[in-house]
Amino acid sequence: MNQHATTARLAFALAAALAMPLAAAPAPRSATPRYDAASHVFRLDAGKVTYAMGVDEDGRLQTLYWGARLAGDDPLGPAMPARERSSFDPKGALSRQEYAGWGGNITAMPALKVKFDDGNRDLVLRYDSYTIDHGALAIVLRDKQAGVDVTLRYTADEATGIIGRSARIENKGKQPLTIDSAAAATWSLPAGSDYSLRYLTGTWAGEWHLQTRAITPGATVLESRRGSTSDENNPWFAINRGGAWDEASGDVWFGALAWSGSWRIRVDEDILGQVRVTGGFNPFDFGYRLKPGEALETPVFYGGYTGGGMGEASRLLHRFEKTAILPHGDEAKLRPVLYNSWEATEFKVDDAGQQRLAEKAAALGVERFVVDDGWFGARNNDHAGLGDWTVNRTKFPNGLKPLIDKVHGLKMSFGLWVEPEMVNPDSDLYRAHPDWVLNFPDRQRSEGRNQLVLNLAREDVKAHLFEVLDKLLTENDIQFLKWDYNRNWSEPGWPQMAPDEQQKVYVAYTHNLYDILRRLREKHPGVEIESCSGGGARVDLGVMALTDEVWPSDNTDASDRLSIQDGFTQAYTPAAMMAWVTGSPSGMNQRPTTLDFRFLSAMQGGLGIGANLLDWTATDDATAKRYVAEYKTIRATVQRGDLYRLLSPQGRAPWSATNSVSADRRQAVLFAFQRQAEEARAFPTLRLQGLDPAARYRVRYIHGSAVPGTPDAASGAYWMQHGIDLALKGDFDAAGVVFEKR
């Protein structure tokens, strides 16, 4: 085959793929931007937020304001360049630019850095024009001499005030260029001091640790270089002003990047005390080549503001995710109660055994039955078979149909585990196509979990994966896929491309992943998908736009999950957060907990069961059946309501408590947990939030009780101001309380 012709076809296909939108999601309810020609100021007013920017005398587009909503006639602008401080910091060098190129006298962190084939690395972006179309503002910045246009796109969600920003970088010159780094946006906070940063870190089985640090002169870098989102850092941040963090009050600016590949968010404070947050593609090993006429579009970087503290910042993000990010928006189905058979069987799955588990699950009230790893290919352990997505006829002699029919007959939907992006070297797929994995020719291929990463940037690999998944869904009546991803990248080569084009793999891979998910959803609209990556290593607003739920962690220990879920909900909605009840003692840490504690912990998200049901006693079955029935009466409130975090479990704190309130405020659900009893310290009084103060709420206990003298009914004001004292005693005690408006 002609190598040059092959490379040309691959380049054409890649260019077409990168021209597509990043992810399909419900359209946000956008506020209409405004432009004042006299002051040269652009303004977005949405929710309780105003965002404004203006063009200064030298053509720089500068941030003017981001904060609480202002009156429509309040003056903003004109923009002024930063004054000269010395010859080391000349005029304009530290201006609050919306999207700065690296060029001229700029010393602040640029949003875009490029180099040209003639050796030039100077890029000075100046305002050119704007358009407003269907609630979206597009501003064109241009370096006419270099032949580079950058189109900045802004949307503002009317309900939450959350702003979406992205950039399209186009080579309009006559020579190729290479993008060294490309951000989606730079957010400039109001001038001031005493800012503090929050972010999320973790590792496998220990995701979602909430970190806090003061912002001081210099830089803090949050990133993934791993090819995917990762659990090391998550592409989310929150910044407050005033030092102390509070759930209920205080200024908080926050943001999240909609990208499932390698990413970076950098927080800078410059010598003037100006705080900036710049985020987008990770520039590490980036080197993205643009020929004349080619363009690159960044992911969307969302940002918001509230004066209502960290709790309200989370609730705004949750509402935005539910209405504008997750598929189906307000019309999305509630997460069904799920059973997954992995803990019961691991790789030893077969038709008869799965049917027995299905019968047990259905008797508990489970609504979805999922067969995990081991149903396909020569898959008897994690050493072989991955990539061969055909039913193992030894385990399922008549295919999946008998099991699927059994599950449907038990009034449950049916799901399967898949890991399409990976392959075992010991597989038919790899033996046929060893060139399909990420690799550098003649170099060792590093394995993780005995598997390699397929190069989804290749159009033939993308086509193959869509074909086999489409065939699986077409031939079997499947309603759910648990889409896993169990390792990071290594040797990220793309030998089929020209050497100067190979680093496009980071962007093209993620675009093609999105395209597969999008096309599967379009062709099989009844199939729901969960994003899983050995737990929570692929959770971001990009993949969430194309999946219905996410798996926060492989750690299902009920006590550890309190901290995991607390960290997760800082940024992401419980509507997408799956949580399982598994065995005791925990396989993760050998900690024993009661079935009551395990159910109440898992009921704070989408409830699942992953224990070996064949080991449960009749008493266990009865307990589980009761909790499943109780959960169905409150899940709309838990999944679609507003979440209030009352007691934080972070840092191995002894207590945890949350309450959720339905949109109409007719129901509230309180969960309280005591990990460790402490001598002479009673469980704290819990004062609920979000209730209707004038309404009366009757109390019903799912589990646990209040101290003697607690009323059966009282006003919302009473429960929020006086509170409730729960009778929690001993280690790993818990309570679940429902408040119903009378």
Which role does the model predict for each range below?
Residues 112-114, 122-127, 288-307, 732-739:
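Short Pro-Gly-centered flexible turn/kink motifs
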Residues 103-123, 242-262, 304-329, 366-373, ...:
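Glycine-rich, aromatic-flanked loop segments that form ligand/cofactor-binding clefts
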Residues 397-399, 431-433, 437-596, 606, ...:
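Active-site neighborhood of glycoside hydrolase catalytic domains
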Residues 48, 167, 293, 339, ...:
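Conserved, mostly hydrophobic/aromatic
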Residues 28-35, 39-43, 51-52, 61-268, ...:
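Polysaccharide-binding surfaces and accessory modules of carbohydrate-active proteins
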Residues 48, 237, 247, 649-693:
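Carbohydrate-binding surface patches
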